[in-house]
């Protein structure tokens, strides 16, 4: 945690201040002072490193990947008195994170100081953001003055766990695509990659002692269209979609992430979400006669509302089957040997217990172990898994359902069903990662559903930006940090994944790094727009949904449909039409709620800034808008 030094910085820099001329840094640093003047990078840049910097060669490689490849600047290692870019190791104040850094730029050059290699690395990420967006280009940029503003920046993270979860089970992402994901994370000072490696739709990691897990569980029939509406697979159809990571792939990803100061958290999701495992070992459910297949995207789970759900197929491991624990011991032995991180995530979420209630084996287990209900049955399972994981020298983490029926000793809780579970777990002195779906589920809609790819729920950028990883009521001593989750049921491609992730991942990055008092929505929006330019250069996809209007619909005078609109981003003008023609800035501007005129069947709206279109043209049929009226 960042302590006293930060509060002094608030007094120096002001809270939530932002000048248009200041560099657009995300996440916003604790303290940043700018002065007149800039340092232009020379054609030959001399660099020096303090003795003891362990990853000097990697830092040189990183500098070369942009400065030499993109800017054409040659690099030369020299003594510090000849260097225009110096990397120095310092002693960290007791109140500061070892990930802290200081960055100074003046007429003599650039100085990056930090108590650790991680801090030096984060200083470099800030350095890149001080350069023009063209530094992110994929090819050489000529005739550019690569200048950096004179500044003094002091920075440190708010929390230690700054995570993103990537679901590689529902849709598979290749090793190289995961590396790109890691690069994008690192650029915004994330330091935990949570890999959701297993689910009903795929088993994505090699377990050498259990080859059937990937031979059977990693592949399914290929489908195109809307997830949840696919037809059921024929057992005989070719299983052409899927893939998995070999253990050598995992080692390569771990090394790649570690160079960028990112730890990888593996998740093996049990006892529910286990259909891919059961396709390989069907006798491990409480309904062993089921003809299991890896799920291909057809709907078998149902959520009727009120937080309740049920399944058409038993996709759970059976807590009463001793062979389950033997198999899990084998799996976690190999997982623990692969991943250096202290935690292993065992899932524990969305276990439909109706199948257990019908099982004679479960009834015998309850009688033998004096278990009162199905929550205690799940707790029995979780505690046994916790002991298996502990026997491998690791700590267990799970989604907040692992609290049901009694929390296992020492277990970490990832709080996704709001903040309540995480707050309660922290008061019980259990480590907590805050990941509430109401702020951090970046697979939800981020704009009007009529303009977005199909998904569910709603999480607009501004709401994401309100995320506080240490919510009121939590014991901050036990809150490790926070993370965003990118579930991939509906994400068929990397471009779609990027669209859902950015810019909401900017918002979470700032929420987990920057002091709460430094966050400012209007400033954040301005900075995002600069980072959109950086992403354009890098070829990274992103969503511009924040520019689109937010609509609410109601009935007035019994039958007339009234539409109210507002913007998420300030200083936009909304223009609209009912005449089947796209509205330009000469069409009526929205000022107050509008009523569909008689005979009109479609509303068209678009946002403008300074007379130029900035949002998407939204085509809103009356029939669709009527569906939003609450009766």
Where are these regions (language model features)?
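Contiguous, structured surface segment used for ligand recognition
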Residues: 20-159, 496, 511-538
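Bacterial Sec-dependent N-terminal signal peptides
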Residues: 1-24
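Feature activates predominantly on carbohydrate-active enzymes
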Residues: 94-326, 330-343, 384, 388, ...
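Flexible, acidic glycine-rich loops studded with aromatic residues
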Residues: 395-411, 417-562
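Active-site neighborhood of glycoside hydrolase catalytic domains
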Residues: 305-411, 416-427
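Short, compositionally stereotyped local motifs that mark structural "simplifiers"
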Residues: 25-38, 48, 515, 519-631
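Flexible loop/turn segments at secondary-structure boundaries
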Residues: 55-56, 172-174, 200-206, 271-277, ...
């Amino acid at each position: 945690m960042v302590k006293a030094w930060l509060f002094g910085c608030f007094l120096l820099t002001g809270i939530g201040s932002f000048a248009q001329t200041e560099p657009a840094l995300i996440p916003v640093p604790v303290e940043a002072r700018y002065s007149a003047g800039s340092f232009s990078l020379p054609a030959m840049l001399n660099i020096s490193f303090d003795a003891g910097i362990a990853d000097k060669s990697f830092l040189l490689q990183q500098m070369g990947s942009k400065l030499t490849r993109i800017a054409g600047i040659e690099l030369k290692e020299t003594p510090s008195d000849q260097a225009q870019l110096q990397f120095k190791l310092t002693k960290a104040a007791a109140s500061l994170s070892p990930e802290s850094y200081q960055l100074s730029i003046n007429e003599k050059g650039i100085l990056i100081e930090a108590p650790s290699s991680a801090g030096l690395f984060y200083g470099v990420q800030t350095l890149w953001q001080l350069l023009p967006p063209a530094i992110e280009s994929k090819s050489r940029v000529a005739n550019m003055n690569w200048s950096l503003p004179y500044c003094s920046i002091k920075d440190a993270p708010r929390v230690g766990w700054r995570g993103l979860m990537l679901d590689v089970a529902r849709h598979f992402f290749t090793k190289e695509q995961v590396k790109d994901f890691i690069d994008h994370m690192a650029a915004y000072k994330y330091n935990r990659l949570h890999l959701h490696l297993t689910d009903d739709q795929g088993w994505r990691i090699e377990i050498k002692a259990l080859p059937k897990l990937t031979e059977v569980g990693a592949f399914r029939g290929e489908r195109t269209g809307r997830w949840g509406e696919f037809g059921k697979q024929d057992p005989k159809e070719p299983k052409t979609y899927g893939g998995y990571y070999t253990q050598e792939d995992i080692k390569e990803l771990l090394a790649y992430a570690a160079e960028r100061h990112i730890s990888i958290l593996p998740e093996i999701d049990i006892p529910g979400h286990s259909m891919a495992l059961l396709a390989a070992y069907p006798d491990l459910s409480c309904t062993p006669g089921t003809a299991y297949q890896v799920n291909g995207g057809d709907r078998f789970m149902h959520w009727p509302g009120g937080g309740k759900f049920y399944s058409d197929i038993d996709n759970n491991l059976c807590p009463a089957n001793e062979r389950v624990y033997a198999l899990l011991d084998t799996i976690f032995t190999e997982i623990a040997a692969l991943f250096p991180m202290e935690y292993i995530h065992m899932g524990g979420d969305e276990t439909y217990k109706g199948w257990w209630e019908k099982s004679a084996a479960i009834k015998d287990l309850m009688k033998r172990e004096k278990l009162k209900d199905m929550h205690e049955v799940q707790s029995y399972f979780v505690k046994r898994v916790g002991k298996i994981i502990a026997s491998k020298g690791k700590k267990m983490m799970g989604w907040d359902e692992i609290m049901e029926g009694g929390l296992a000793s020492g277990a970490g809780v990832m709080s996704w069903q709001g903040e309540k579970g995480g707050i309660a777990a922290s008061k019980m002195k259990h480590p907590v990662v805050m990941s509430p779906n109401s702020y951090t589920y970046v697979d939800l809609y981020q704009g009007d559903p009529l303009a977005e790819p199909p998904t569910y729920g709603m999480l607009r950028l501004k709401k994401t930006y309100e995320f506080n990883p240490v919510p009121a009521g939590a014991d901050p001593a036990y809150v490790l940090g926070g993370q965003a989750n990118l579930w991939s049921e509906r994400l068929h491609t990397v471009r779609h994944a990027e669209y859902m992730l950015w810019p909401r991942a900017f918002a979470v990055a700032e929420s987990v790094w920057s002091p709460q008092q430094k966050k400012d929505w209007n400033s954040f929006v301005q900075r995002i727009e600069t980072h959109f330019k950086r992403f354009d250069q890098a070829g990274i996809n992103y969503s511009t949904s924040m520019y689109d209007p937010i609509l609410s619909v109601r009935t007035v005078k019994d039958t007339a449909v009234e539409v109210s609109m507002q913007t998420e981003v300030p200083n936009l003008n909304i223009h609209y039409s009912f005449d089947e023609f796209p509205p330009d800035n000469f069409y009526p501007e929205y000022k107050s709620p509008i009523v569909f005129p008689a005979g009109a069947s479609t509303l068209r709206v678009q946002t403008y800034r300074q007379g130029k279109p900035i949002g998407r043209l939204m085509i809103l049929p009356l029939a669709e808008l009527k569906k939003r009226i609450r009766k």
